[in-house]
C-alpha cells in the first residue's frame, strides 16, 4: 500500500484566504495537490497556465513532487510593476 502524505494548498486574496488540507499518494505533483484541493472550482480566477506556484515561498513547477507537510501556494499575478511603483513614489517625494 503506497504511503499517504498530507499537504496544504493556500490561495490568498486581500479580503479572504483559502487553506485546504488534502491527502495524496506519495509521488503526487504540485498540480495534483491543487486539483485535489478543489480551489480551481471555488475560484475561477485561478489559471494554472498564468498563476505562479510555490512551496513555502519558493517557486516550483506544477510537475514538481510534494512532500508530506508541504504548503503549496498559488500566487496572484502582480497588477503593477514594482519598479514603476517605486519610481513613482521617489518622484513624488522628490517633488515635495
From Swiss-Prot:
InterPro entries in the cross-refs: Mopterin_synth/thiamin_S_b, RnfH, RnfH_sf
A matching Pfam family: Ub-RnfH
UniProt superkingdom: Bacteria
Entry similarity comment: Belongs to the UPF0125 (RnfH) family.
HAMAP family xrefs: UPF0125_RnfH
Protein name: UPF0125 protein YfjF
Highest classification ranks of the organism: Bacteria, Pseudomonadati, Pseudomonadota, Gammaproteobacteria, Enterobacterales
The gene coding this protein: yfjF
